[in-house]
Amino acid sequence: DYPIVFALHGKGGKNTSWVNQLKSFTDSGEFVGIYPQGHLDSWNLGTEPSKADDVAFINSIIKELENYNNLNMNKIYAIGTSNGSGMVNKLGIHTSHFKAIAPVVSQLMESMPILDNTKPVSIFQINGAKDFTIPINGGSAFGHNFLDAYKSAELWASNFECNLSPEVKSINGTVSYTHLRAHETTD
């Protein structure tokens, strides 16, 4: 059975941007790629042009995918960039479908608290110090108040009862922080 990867475009973007980036993986059968298009080319995080219920939209796609017996509904993942990254965070908070999410170049926002009933999910949060669009140290952009990227990772970790003293690795100027639950490994 094939794992499923949702790939969400950024604000103003198109779902086709992910097709070519992930084509070699989907063509080789590593997973089935799902590339939804946000209404008005954005995902509704509160201040965007779209006021669509994007959580319901993604849930409806997942419900439809349940009709295919060659898909592994226990291995659903989501990756998104920028506005799509914010939507990936929202899906991680408001749904229980995802085994892991990868928000790229965004972090949690003050308006997006992790809920008590949020199902633990693996998070691969990517931020960059040279990204001047989304403030890595927190602050306002695009009508949102972003948390500091590291604080965002800590908030996920603390809500999912992970070790708050992360494993830190630095390779060629890139630093990774890994927060594990007691029974997890990085393998």
Residue ranges and their predicted role:
Residues I136-L147:
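Short, flexible/disordered intra-domain loops and linkers
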Residues D131-I134:
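Acidic catalytic loop of the alpha/beta-hydrolase fold
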Residues N145-S170:
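Acidic, glycine-rich loop-and-strand cores that form catalytic or ligand-binding grooves
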Residues Q125-N127:
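Short beta-strand/loop motif that positions the catalytic acidic residue
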Residues Y2-Y77, T81, G86-K90, H94:
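Serine-hydrolase catalytic machinery in alpha/beta-hydrolase-like enzymes
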Residues T118-S122:
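Short, proline-enriched alpha-helix->beta-strand connector loops that line the catalytic pocket
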Residues H179-A182, T186-D187:
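Single conserved hydrophobic/aromatic residue that forms the stacking wall/gate
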